[in-house]
């Protein structure tokens, strides 16, 4: 696959233009270039189960941002 340039990068402020979180704005936490997806702070939050470990002896649930396709976000000019 060829190197693809995206119009957005980590730290940019973007607005969600499609999907369940349409209209929300947030900062990009990371860009997944190979999948053409971005993770936006506070958008598309899912509850994930955590197995017990030394850090979290009881396990539990956490809220985690899930990736959004790059075509569903638009850069917001500040």
UniProtKB/Swiss-Prot annotation:
The keyword Ribosomal protein applies. The keyword Ligase does not apply. One of its GO terms (cellular component) is ribosome. InterPro entries: KOW, Rib_uL2_dom2, Ribosomal_uL24, Ribosomal_uL24_CS, Ribosomal_uL24_KOW, Translation_prot_SH3-like_sf. Pfam families: KOW, ribosomal_L24. Keywords: Ribonucleoprotein, Ribosomal protein, RNA-binding, rRNA-binding. One of its GO terms (biological process) is translation. GO terms for molecular function: rRNA binding; structural constituent of ribosome. Belongs to the universal ribosomal protein uL24 family. PANTHER family: MITOCHONDRIAL RIBOSOMAL PROTEIN L24. Part of the 50S ribosomal subunit. One of two assembly initiator proteins, it binds directly to the 5'-end of the 23S rRNA, where it nucleates assembly of the 50S subunit. One of the proteins that surrounds the polypeptide exit tunnel on the outside of the subunit. This is Large ribosomal subunit protein uL24. It comes from Campylobacter curvus (strain 525.92).
